[in-house]
């Protein structure tokens, strides 16, 4: 017959197709027989939806490894944290002796011009991302050495970027904990996309420091000022001698 096509095996391909159930059975047998998941209350309570940024930041803020750079009395307050009274291990702080294993630099104490290149070298050897805490007045502004010292650096932020300033002379251990908590919040809000934008650079650093000589502010003129001859208190008639009388007594 010219108008009909006969299959070689005697079956018509248009009418002898497998059923939908047969196709489903074949698919389940060949593509891995995995049943539909049953989402229960117990399973839903053990599932956490998060992002790669949150997971990475959680791991970093829970394991801050500080490099302790202590040069003065502020470091004694930080050394108290290592003891069992404050127990700074609960924040995941593990002090490291090598800058290549640390991601947090804690500068505590006065920084001099001679120690400035060594501090910058330690900071550059730390892997990214890295953070800096300036601890104490001498580290932040130079402290009591900022008025007349020719060797003290007026703020460590002139050498390396600082993420958190911790004022005090010296700061108490509780204040150090507060600084660590604030730093952990900063780490937890970071993102991979914003890391290049937030990358901090050195503000300025020059060797030699190019300091120029200025006139001294301490002239000693206040030693020649005459004092008033008044009693220290109404009940005690003890007069105050002026500078000239004190000089005469010393000469005699």
Swiss-Prot record:
[4Fe-4S] cluster binds at residues 73-74, 138, 169. Binds 1 [4Fe-4S] cluster. Its cofactor is [4Fe-4S] cluster. It is found in: Cellular thylakoid membrane. InterPro entries: NADH_UbQ_OxRdtase-like_20kDa, NADH_UQ_OxRdtase_20Kd_su. One of its GO terms (biological process) is electron transport coupled proton transport. Its main location: membrane. It holds the Pfam family Oxidored_q6. Disulfide bonds: none annotated. GO terms for molecular function: 4 iron, 4 sulfur cluster binding; iron ion binding; NADH dehydrogenase (ubiquinone) activity; quinone binding. Its EC number is 7.1.1.-. Keywords: 4Fe-4S, Iron, Iron-sulfur, Membrane, Metal-binding, NAD, NADP, Plastoquinone, Quinone, Thylakoid, Translocase, Transport. The keyword Phosphoprotein does not apply. It is a peripheral membrane protein. Belongs to the complex I 20 kDa subunit family. PANTHER family: NADH DEHYDROGENASE, NADH DEHYDROGENASE [UBIQUINONE] IRON-SULFUR PROTEIN 7, MITOCHONDRIAL. NDH-1 can be composed of about 15 different subunits; different subcomplexes with different compositions have been identified which probably have different functions. This is NAD(P)H-quinone oxidoreductase subunit K.
